[in-house]
């Protein structure tokens, strides 16, 4: 629709030159607005990097020592990106969310450093993490709600910047919970993993959208303009032929001595401004205005209208 509108002139006639500069400016302005919007949205999303956490889990079952290493957690938004290790300790009691201010942790005697394993929900992440820190935890591991599988996200916990806090999935958290409840001594080493930048994906998609819009416009313009040019050329040829035919049907007259048109008080030819003389050939238009044939014919080919009243010779 944008390109079709561009081929019309002010009076509704086809513009043989195709899209006008004003339309190009409007399309360029639209593309500029799109790029500014994408850049602004990119600025808003920038800086939200997500850091994964490698968890090296070690525990003993019978005579076997089992170790699991996986990128199974993410650091909280306000957590220091540091390595931390220790025995995994649960909150005392049946409720594992550590929301009560009276919550304690049963730390094994042989443990120098320990990590609190806490269930998500019931209170803010900040409350859980600060409570564990007050009880002496060196780090906090929070596992997600039941039914969420191993889905994780970077937690928001302002005011807890001095203690490492990571989130793990519910399935992994329940595995650790059951092991510890069965009396298994579990230790975990938390190490900084990789940085993921969602804004980079957003940038790529934004750039792709902008380029796609630009390429689409250029493709449509290039595919459409030759057709418009050919159509306009044919129409111009036909129009010129119609004008020539109409000119040939206009009345001609040779001025003779005594004709009133030769009176010095009469008007001169408004095209060349010369006075009419005997033997001059004049062309009389449908509006009854007349001019030198040699003057008016080129004028009509170019303008199609009477120089005085703008009467169109193609219209009855």
Curated annotation (Swiss-Prot):
Signal sequence span is 1-12
Which PROSITE patterns does the UniProt record give?
A: ZF_RING_2
Matching entries from InterPro entries are given as: PA_dom_sf (IPR046450), PA_domain (IPR003137), RING_finger_E3_ligase (IPR051834), Znf_RING (IPR001841), Znf_RING/FYVE/PHD (IPR013083)
User: Where is it located?
Assistant: Membrane
Q: What happens when the gene is disrupted?
A: Male mutants fecundity is normal.
Protein's membrane topology:
Multi-pass membrane protein
* Boundaries of every PA domain copy: 84-178
Q: What is its main location?
A: membrane
Under what name is this protein listed?
RING finger protein 148
- Provide the species name: Mus musculus (Mouse)
């Amino acid at each position: 629709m944008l390109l079709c509108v561009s081929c019309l002139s002010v009076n509704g006639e086809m513009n043989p030159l195709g899209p006008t500069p004003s339309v190009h400016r409007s399309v360029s302005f639209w593309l500029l607005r799109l790029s500014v919007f994408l850049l602004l949205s990119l600025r808003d999303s920038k800086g939200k990097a997500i850091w994964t956490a490698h968890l090296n889990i070690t525990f003993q079952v019978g005579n076997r020592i089992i170790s699991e290493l996986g990128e199974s957690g993410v650091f909280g938004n306000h957590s220091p990106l540091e390595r931390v290790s220790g025995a995994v300790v649960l909150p005392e009691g049946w409720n594992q969310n550590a929301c009560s201010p009276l919550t304690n942790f049963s730390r094994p005697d042989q443990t120098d450093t320990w990590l609190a394993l806490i269930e998500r929900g019931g209170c803010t992440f900040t409350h859980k993490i600060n409570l564990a820190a007050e009880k002496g935890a060196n780090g906090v591991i929070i596992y997600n709600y039941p039914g969420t599988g191993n889905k994780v996200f970077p937690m928001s916990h302002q005011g807890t910047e001095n203690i490492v806090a990571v989130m793990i999935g519910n399935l992994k958290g329940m595995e650790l919970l059951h092991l510890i409840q069965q009396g298994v001594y579990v230790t975990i080493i938390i190490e900084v993993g990789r940085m993921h930048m969602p804004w980079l994906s957003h940038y790529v998609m934004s750039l792709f959208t902008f380029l796609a819009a630009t390429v689409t416009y250029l493709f449509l313009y290039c595919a459409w303009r030759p057709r418009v040019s050919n159509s306009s050329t044919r129409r111009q040829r036909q129009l010129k032929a119609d004008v020539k035919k109409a000119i040939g049907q206009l009345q001609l007259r040779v001025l003779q001595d005594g004709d009133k048109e030769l009176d010095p008080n009469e008007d001169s030819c408004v095209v060349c401004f010369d006075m009419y003389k005997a033997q001059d050939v004049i062309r009389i238009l449908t509006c009854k205005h007349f001019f030198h044939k040699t003057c008016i014919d080129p004028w009509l080919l170019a303008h199609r209208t009477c120089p005085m009243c703008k009467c169109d010779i193609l219209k009855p």
